[in-house]
Amino acid sequence: MVSIMNKNELITEILKNEVVKALGCTEVGLIGYTVAKAKPEDLYSIKEIKLILDKGTFKNAFSVGVPNTNKFGILPAVVGGLLGREENKLEVFKDIKYDEKLEEFIENKLKIEVIDSDVYCKVIIKANKVYEAETKGSHSGKSLSDDLKNAYKSLTLKDFIDYIEDIPEEVIKIIKETIETNKNLSTPEVPEDFISLDLKDEILNHMLKKTVSAVYNRMIGINKPAMAIAGSGNMGLTATLPIIAYDEIKGHDEEKLTKSITLSALTTIYSAYHSSYISAMCGCVNRGGIGAVSGLSYYIFGFDRIEESIKSFTANLPGIVCDGGKIGCALKIASGVFAIYLSLFSKVPYTNGIVGKDFKECIENIGKIGKAMKPVDDEIIEILKNKK
């Protein structure tokens, strides 16, 4: 077991690495960043660009908006990477001015290979010579060791609860940045030509509008960053904005909000580590939802109902599939917010389906289902490849 001091140091290190800023969908950011690392000085000397992508990166970049391009998908992500700066990493599209001529020049030179791997992007550019770059293990290429991740997986809900009672100042700064950054992606309303939301329940209505609008804005490629959690911006939005919305309705309590968001981030990461970063199971709803349920339950009831709320959530939405990053993700997140809200006020016994006897077993069971869905993921990839 990790000692008390080491537990807190471990948790802090995990949070510092897994709660990071990203502009646009993290998968197009990954592609753009890797292209920026590989690009030649003379872009018009390029003869071929080959991308080797893991299935999840291909899937999530396929239909999603790319910031500062007014376009969707992998091609503009590549062009954006050619125009962007490597030092901006996952914010590689920041300040770019899109070039339609460059897109026309590149379009027929782009080849894509999809492989079965964890997070992976390799770029091979043939120009006056061959330029190569790869990013693997995480979207920024900065990957935590398996030992650290396994140590984190051995922690308990009580460890997380103990941690949020005395959060280090460096983590408080990250959490405050997360709150402000993710709030900034929300708009008062969601476009009516996409979805009409006007519920009588004031709390649920505000939670839905705040969360769904932010995810929608991110998926169309709005030029504003999100704080990603465990490699996903949408997961970060789902894990934080329902709690922020509740806090706004009930009257702002900064200390309680900071603790709740921290707990949400901790349980979201914990859930991600018990599954795989990208799979056929929608991580935004399942992992981000677990986080939001944990944080909201703490905010409303204290520590007493967290485990029961997670059991109720486990009985509801796990299994919802991920068919890539796109504006439709906002609809799945809407379903997730409903499930999060229901979980706070319901109780489901351990005898029901995949519901675990405690926090840890619930998350382990959800992770097992996600890992077993590989054939589903393969079929989704084939459907996308065959789209014209």
From Swiss-Prot:
Co-factor binding comment: Binds 1 [4Fe-4S] cluster per subunit.
Cofactors, names only: [4Fe-4S] cluster
GO molecular function: 4 iron, 4 sulfur cluster binding; L-cysteine desulfhydrase activity; metal ion binding
Keyword Lyase: yes
Pfam families: SDH_alpha
Keywords noted in UniProt: 4Fe-4S, Iron, Iron-sulfur, Lyase, Metal-binding
Residues annotated as binding [4Fe-4S] cluster: 282, 322, 329
Highest taxon of source: Archaea
pH dependence: Optimum pH is 7.6.
Annotated catalytic residues: 25
Function text: Catalyzes the cleavage of L-cysteine to form 2-aminoprop-2-enoate and sulfide. The former then spontaneously hydrolyzes to pyruvate and NH(3). May be responsible for the production of sulfide required for the biosynthesis of iron-sulfur centers in this archaea. Is very specific for L-cysteine, with no activity being detected with D-cysteine, L-homocysteine, 3-mercaptopropionate (cysteine without the amino group), cysteamine (cysteine without the carboxylate), or mercaptolactate (the hydroxyl analog of cysteine).
Subunit details: Homotrimer.
Name this protein carries in UniProt: L-cysteine desulfidase
